[in-house]
């Protein structure tokens, strides 16, 4: 009887110590793969879901949409955007997949512009031109993130005066909303302390 009790206790202890498998998102992502530090700031994965069970996964590294699970014409849930499975992949395989682009989306000719009679020279990271805010644009920065409710995520990034050559301290906010009609509503807001240029967008590949 004593041996049976010992074995029973041992079995219970083993069961208690066995780690539970981490739950994945509907698109198969593990949140732990998005939890690390980049430039001293913590990254994470945030999941939005609506009443139709549409799921949108977003990381605050670059303000990126990582996956979008939405029903296809046959009602089957499919991931319809390109994205990586971890922060490390986004770092080691530089791309604009799903990213919030800033300060200035698209190309600035020769990386130069004049504002209020002041000439500015930006990094020329694309065949002699400045593309998507430079080599360290918003897509490679860590945003502050606040999950407002199950369907809304607020992302905030403050760029300092002179970052990537652009003038002015600027606070940029990106509000991502998953609506109940299966749409993603993205709203941009920027506040600066001196004349500057800003042109933000999202760079998802569908």
Describe the residue ranges of each PLM region.
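Sec-dependent signal peptide recognition
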Residues: 2-8
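C-terminal motif of bacterial Sec signal peptides marking the signal peptidase cleavage site
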Residues: 14-16
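Surface-exposed acidic/polar loop and edge beta-strand patches at domain peripheries
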Residues: 18-206
